[in-house]
Amino acid sequence: MVVKTVVVRFVIGAAIVGAIVALGAVWYVRGPGPLAFAGGKSVALADYRDGDPTGVSATMRQASLLERGKYLTEAADCAVCHTAPGGKEYAGGFAFKLPFGTMYSTNITPDYETGIGKYTDQEFLDAMHRGIRRDGARLYPAMPYTSYTYISDADALAIKAYLFSLKPVRAVLPENTLLFPFNQRWAMMFWSLVFNPDTRFQPDSSQSLKWNRGAYLAEALAHCGECHTPRNIGFALNNRKKFAGAPVAGWRAFNISSDKATGLGSWTDEDIAFYLSLGHASGHGTASGAMGEAVDHSFSKMAPDDIEAMVTFLRSVPPSTTPDFSVKSAPAPVSHRDGVTASVLGKKIFEGACASCHGWTGESAVSPLATLTGSAGVNDPSASNVALVVIGGTRRLTPDGALSMPSFGHAYSDDEIAAVSNYVTARFGARASSLTARDVAKLREQVAD
């Protein structure tokens, strides 16, 4: 009897210790919330006395429901992910290519059969905040519901009202092709239990209305962390390295913390505002890839006071260093001085296809948007962004019209693209890259339509 009692106590004790360890592990992996760094006190929206940081820009407070919904839909950048290349806007079909398969974005037009036309208000909120579809199935976090969960109910329903005002598009989309066990949607219930806070935005009472507005825009609507914050072991955002930069579908989303060496710390407020609004900041480069799309479809359509609020918030994010990257460029080369790892092939391609626009010094005479010196991509020793721009080209919308760089993906081989990319980083960047043909082939796979 004594032995039995001891065994029972041992089992109970072990279970308690195990539970504590498990809870501790979950707490550690989950990490801090997105605004924990501010160290202030979160309060209910109704209890924040300085105003309402949610909703639309202060300049649009008298706008109609549909006008507010359109503004918020654009701020949330919905069109980029829910529009396939060459497809109808919001009709879905955009492919997310992952190491374990491909998934496709959904049709969010109000079509009754293939879209969201049957969604009630509560079902729409469940999808936005909890990642749960109308049929009860779990959404994958390619839909950034762990960020959208902070969007207020009123704003989410304004987005729904705008989407439901659009013309329904019948679009039968491809089936996801995810490998086991990633194709088991039910398992996302446990992932969400750990990593989705399922809570609406709560202002920080120690911060200004402008800061809180910027936080709401950056964390909830614009979901900046989804690209710019590294992932943890559970593929959720690792806010211990908030905004430190991360790889996204082959591209490198750069450090946007306040770090002076590798982030935005050396940028002026005007630099950041210009980059968000126009996709370019003098001495810092031009937005391409997903960031370019975010500028075109979202940030460029935001009111100036909202851009200013985001700048205020970004300034407050603690510095997080990216060891292999520097925002500091090499001095502009003189004459035809080559980079330290320049190849004959790389120089030949640059001379034939690049120099006429970008210049031998990296200071473009055609447009400041084509200047290479200072560009984050050129200073990235992985050279992935440089290679992807060469492969796919890029296009920027400016107040004076569109400015394009053509795609060279079909004109040059993987070896040639690697050579010219390495030449560019060696000649104009802080550190030479060593991209290989195999690296370029992998990049092609990740961005292929």
List the predicted regions and their residue ranges.
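C-type cytochrome heme c attachment motif
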Residues: Y71-T83, T106-N107, E123-R130, P141, ...
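Sequence/structural segment immediately N-terminal to covalent heme-attachment motifs in c-type
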Residues: R61-A84, E89-K97, F190-L193, Q202-N232, ...
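Signal peptide-directed extracytoplasmic domains
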Residues: K88-T102, P110-D111, D121, A127, ...
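Active-site substrate-binding loop specific to GH73 endo-beta-N-acetylglucosaminidase modules
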Residues: Y90-G101, T106-N107, T229-H280
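Solvent-exposed, acidic/flexible segments
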Residues: A58-L66, Y71, G101, G117-D121, ...
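Axial heme c-ligation environment in periplasmic c-type cytochrome domains
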Residues: Y104-K118, H129-A154, E175-N176, A253-L264, ...
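Post-cleavage N-terminal segment of exported redox proteins
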Residues: V2-Q62, M103, A127, I132, ...
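Short loop/beta submotifs within extracellular cysteine-rich repeat domains
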Residues: V80, E89, E113-I116, D126, ...
